[in-house]
C-alpha cells in the first residue's frame, strides 16, 4: 500500500456536490434550494469505545470535524452538511441487526451487542468517494467475516446483502422523494461472499475513539476500503446471505454510471468525470485544490486484486 505523507492531510474544503448526478434526474432545483450546514453533532455526546488501537498505519488522518461534517447520507439530504444537521436527533438505541438468509445460524444483535459481540479494533483506511474526493478515516469495528462465521453460510450463499433502516419519520430523505435524491428506499448494497469474507472488510461502530455519529452511519455501517464509498452502506438493520445477486440502490438508479463492483479504478472513468485523480479534502488552501493520483483499488491492490482474477474490470465496474 502506498504511504501518504504530511501533504496528504485532508481538512475540509468546499467543492463539487453530487448535484451533477441529481441534475440527471431533474432534481437540481430542489438540491440547490437546500441549505448547506457545516456543523456536526458534538463529539462529547458520543459513547467512548474500548478497542485495540492501530499501531501499524502511517496514514495521516483527516481531522475529526471534517469526517463528521462532510458526508453523503441521502436519507438526511443531499448536501454535504445536511446529514450532520438533520441526523442530530436520530435515535440509534434501541437497535436491531438481523442476520439471516442462506445461513445455518440466523441471529440478531441488539444495540449493546454491536459493541460487545466481537472484539473491536481500529482500522485506519483510505476512503474514496465516487465523486473523486478522498479522506483518511480511523474506523473502529470488527471484521465482517467474524459475523459471517457466526452465522455459518450455507453452500448456496454467494452474496451478502445489506439494508439500511427504513424510517421516514426519522430520515427526511426517505419521506420526501426529492429531498432524498430520488432514491427508492431502503438503501440496499451487496458484496460477493469472497469480498465480504476478506479481512479488510469492516463492520464499523465508531471512529476517532467514539461511537459513530448519526451522519456517519450510526450505530453500525459497512466499510470496504478498496471500493467507492457508496458501497459502504450506513445504519444497517439487516444482512441477508443470498444465492442470487441483488440489484443494488445506485446500480438500479443509474446502471450506466454505478456498477455492482464499484472498485476504485483510475482507468475507468465515470461517464461524466475522470477517476484518474482525486481531491484531497481541504488540502491546498482556499483558492487551490490539491489533487493526487487515484490508486488502483484505492491503494489496496496487493491485498484484493486476486478477488477479481479473470474479471474484466472495465466491463465489470
Curated annotation (Swiss-Prot):
Which Pfam families does this one have? Oxidored_molyb
What keywords would UniProt list here?
A: Metal-binding, Molybdenum, Oxidoreductase, Periplasm, Signal
Provide a Gene Ontology MF annotation, just one: metal ion binding
Q: Which cysteines bridge via disulfide bonds?
A: none
Q: Tell me where it mainly resides.
A: periplasm
The cofactors it requires, by name, are: Mo-molybdopterin
Binding of Mo-molybdopterin: at which residues?
71, 74-75, 129, 164, 216, 221, 232-234
Q: How is it modified after translation?
A: Predicted to be exported by the Tat system. The position of the signal peptide cleavage has not been experimentally proven.
The family note in this entry says: Belongs to the MsrP family.
Protein's UniProt name? Protein-methionine-sulfoxide reductase catalytic subunit MsrP
The scientific name of the source species is: Histophilus somni (strain 2336)
Q: Which gene encodes it?
A: msrP
Amino acid at each position: 500500500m502506498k504511504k501518504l505523507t504530511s501533504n496528504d492531510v485532508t481538512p475540509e474544503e468546499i467543492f463539487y456536490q453530487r448535484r451533477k448526478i441529481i441534475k440527471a434526474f431533474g432534481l437540481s432545483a430542489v438540491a440547490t434550494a437546500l441549505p448547506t450546514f457545516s456543523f456536526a453533532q458534538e463529539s462529547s455526546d458520543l459513547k467512548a469505545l474500548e478497542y485495540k488501537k492501530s499501531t501499524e498505519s502511517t496514514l495521516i488522518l483527516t481531522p475529526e470535524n471534517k469526517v463528521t461534517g462532510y458526508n453523503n447520507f441521502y436519507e438526511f439530504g443531499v448536501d454535504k452538511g445536511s446529514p450532520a444537521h438533520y441526523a442530530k436527533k436520530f435515535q440509534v438505541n434501541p437497535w436491531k441487526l438481523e442476520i439471516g438468509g442462506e445461513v445455518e445460524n440466523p441471529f440478531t444483535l441488539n444495540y449493546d451487542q454491536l459493541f460487545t459481540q466481537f472484539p473491536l479494533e481500529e482500522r485506519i483506511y483510505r476512503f474514496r468517494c465516487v465523486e473523486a474526493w478522498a479522506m483518511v478515516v480511523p474506523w473502529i469495528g470488527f471484521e465482517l467475516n467474524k459475523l459471517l462465521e457466526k452465522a455459518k453460510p450455507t453452500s448456496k450463499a454467494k452474496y451478502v446483502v445489506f439494508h439500511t433502516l427504513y424510517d421516514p419519520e426519522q430520515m427526511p430523505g426517505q419521506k420526501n422523494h426529492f429531498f432524498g435524491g430520488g432514491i427508492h428506499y431502503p438503501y440496499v448494497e451487496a458484496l460477493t461472499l469472497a469480498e465480504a469474507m476478506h479481512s479488510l472488510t469492516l463492520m464499523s461502530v465508531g471512529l476517532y475513539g467514539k461511537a459513530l455519529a448519526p451522519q456517519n452511519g450510526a450505530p453500525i455501517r459497512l466499510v470496504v476500503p478498496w471500493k467507492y464509498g457508496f458501497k459502504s452502506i450506513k445504519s444497517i438493520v439487516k444482512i441477508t446471505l443470498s444465492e442470487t445477486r441483488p440489484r443494488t440502490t445506485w446500480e438500479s438508479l443509474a446502471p450506466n454510471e454505478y456498477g455492482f463492483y464499484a472498485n476504485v479504478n483510475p482507468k475507468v472513468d465515470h461517464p461524466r468525470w475522470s477517476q484518474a485523480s482525486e481531491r484531497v479534502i481541504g488540502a491546498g488552501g482556499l483558492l487551490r485544490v490539491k489533487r493526487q493520483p487515484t490508486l488502483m483499488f484505492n491503494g489496496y491492490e496487493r491485498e484484493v486484486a486476486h478477488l477479481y482474477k479473470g474479471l474484466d474490470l472495465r466491463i465489470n465496474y
